[in-house]
């Protein structure tokens, strides 16, 4: 019999907040609604989170770091650039599809962060895009990737992958794995040089 995984109260609150924000939006959801939905009082809310923005940060702040940490070893692997791009895009799509609600909140509400949190998020996004762009540049140099603006290619590829969040649900007639494979195939087909 599998052991029950013990979830901390804080993790439970974060999971519930993800569902709440994905349904109603961050700005539109009041602190009282959050407390009511989480089954806590407003004073208890402040025991776990400094502010509503802190709650948002706890939900989305780590997502960019996760993508970057997963991408670094793939980007420098001893493989052809097209193979590394395939693996990078697969990992990106897989991570999005494993965390659909949290990433929907990330893309819809990231502009609600201020100060150091906003700067950290933007820095992580920039580093992630630079990492992918470097692989595209290497692929262009070797003739594997078509010539053109590598920054634009990165933005278009990431935009394609991120657009999955706008319409994918588990009820779609295609599995997450099939969707990820098809998306990566189309993304790479758009980047690779014609033989």
Question: Regions from the language model: what does each represent?
Answer:
Residues 1-8, 195:
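N-terminal intrinsically disordered/low-complexity leader segments
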Residues 9, 13-21, 92, 187:
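Short hydrophobic clusters on alpha-helical segments that form packing/core surfaces
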Residues 12, 20-54, 58:
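Helix-turn-helix
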Residues 58, 72-101, 153-157:
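Hydrophobic alpha-helical connector segments
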Residues 62, 73, 91, 101-105, ...:
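Short, solvent-exposed amphipathic helices
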Residues 65-69, 115-141, 151-155, 178:
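Amphipathic alpha-helical packing segments from all-alpha helical-bundle domains
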Residues 84, 97-116, 166, 170:
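Amphipathic alpha-helical segments used for helix-helix packing
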Residues 91-94, 98, 129-141, 160, ...:
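C-terminal peripheral helix-coil segments that are non-catalytic and often amphipathic
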């Amino acid at each position: 019999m599998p052991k029950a995984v013990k979830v901390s109260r804080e993790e439970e609150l974060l999971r519930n907040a993800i569902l709440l924000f994905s349904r109603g939006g961050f700005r539109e959801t009041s602190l009282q609604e959050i407390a009511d939905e989480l089954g806590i009082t407003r004073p208890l809310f402040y025991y776990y989170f400094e502010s509503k923005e802190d709650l948002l940060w706890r939900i989305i702040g780590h997502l960019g770091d996760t993508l970057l940490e997963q991408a670094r070893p793939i980007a420098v692997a001893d493989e052809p650039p097209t193979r590394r791009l395939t693996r990078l895009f697969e990992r990106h799509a897989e991570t999005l599809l494993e965390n659909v609600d949290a990433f929907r909140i990330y893309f819809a509400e990231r502009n609600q962060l201020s100060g150091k949190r906003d700067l950290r998020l933007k820095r992580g996004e920039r580093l992630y895009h630079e990492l992918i762009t470097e692989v595209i540049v290497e692929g262009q140099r070797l003739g594997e990737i078509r010539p053109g603006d590598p920054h634009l290619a990165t933005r278009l590829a990431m935009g394609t992958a991120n657009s999955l969040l706008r319409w994918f649900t588990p009820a779609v007639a295609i599995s997450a794995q099939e969707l990820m494979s098809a998306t990566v195939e189309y993304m790479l087909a758009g980047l690779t040089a014609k033989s």
